[in-house]
């Protein structure tokens, strides 16, 4: 799993925990539905920090809480 896949999986899990749809997340986080769809479908190769912060605000969690999860614990360093 790469970083973008881990971000998408984390968003899916947070939505699932709250019984939210991506559309509801879009509403509460003030992030366009197309942006969320792009992240979840793997089309966005580098979701921006500001976007992730807005999503965290919608979930009412910190960036630290977002990235402190099993999805990110198993990531290997990406070298390009």
Which functions belong to the PLM regions below?
Residues 15, 26, 56:
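The alpha-helix within a helix-turn-helix
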Residues 43-57:
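Short, basic-rich loop-to-helix N-cap that marks the start of a DNA-contacting helix
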Residues 1-23:
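A short, Lys/Arg-rich alpha-helix, primarily the initiator
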Residues 14, 28, 39, 69:
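Residues in the recognition helix of alpha-helical DNA-binding motifs
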Residues 32, 43, 70-74:
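The DNA-recognition helices of helix-turn-helix-type DNA-binding domains
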Residues 38, 67-80:
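Short, charged recognition helix plus adjacent turn
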Residues 19-38:
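Short alpha-helical DNA-recognition segment
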């Amino acid at each position: 799993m790469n970083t973008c896949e881990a971000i998408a999986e984390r968003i899916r899990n947070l939505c699932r925990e709250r019984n939210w749809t991506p559309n509801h997340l879009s509403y509460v986080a003030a992030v366009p539905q197309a942006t969320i769809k792009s992240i979840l479908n793997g089309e966005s190769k580098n979701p921006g920090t500001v976007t992730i912060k807005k999503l965290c605000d919608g979930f009412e969690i910190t960036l630290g809480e977002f990235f402190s999860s099993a999805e990110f614990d198993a990531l290997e360093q990406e070298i390009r």
